[in-house]
Amino acid sequence: MNENMNVMLKEVDVLKEQLSALRPLPEEALKKIQDALDIEYTYESNRIEGNTLTLQETALVVNEGVTISGKSMREHLEAINHTEAISYIKDIAKQDIEISERTIKEIHALILHGIDRENAGRYRTVPVMILGSTHMPPQPYLIEKQMEDFILRFKQMEKEKVHPVLIAAYLHDELVRIHPF
C-alpha cells in the first residue's frame, strides 16, 4: 500500500474518532440523518440503473406511499425494494450475521421482488456487457466459483484486520467486476 493511501486511511480514522466523540447523537437527529441518507442512496443507485424518479419523488414513494403520475410500476418498486434491501442490510449488520453468497442472493431477491421473479436472487445465466465500459464481466459458468472466491477473500481480509475502507473498496470493486446478477 502506498504512502498516500496510508495518510488517507489515517485521516478517515481521525474523522471517525471525531464523529464518535459527538455520540450519542439525539435519537431523533440520528434518524433524520439516516433516513435522508437512505433516500439519497436509493435515488442514486436506481438513477444509475435508468430509473427516472427524482430525489423528491423517490422520497414520496418510499416515505409516503405516493404513486407518481407518468412513472412505471417498476420504477416505484425499484425505490421501495431498494429501501427494503437497505433495511435488511442494516439488520444483518446489527445482528452480526456473516455475509455469504446466500445473504447476497437474499439482498438481490429483495431488490427484484415483484419485478423479476425468475431472476430474483439468482446469479445471471447469460453473458452481459456494461454500457460505456471496456470491462467484460465473466461468463455465467464462472460466476459461482468467482463468488465463492470473493467471499473467501473477504473473510480473509476481515481475519487479517484489513482497514474497513479497503474491505469496502474490495467488495464494491469485485461485485462490479463479477457482475453476478
Spans of features found by a protein language model:
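FIC/Doc superfamily catalytic core
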Residues: 1-181
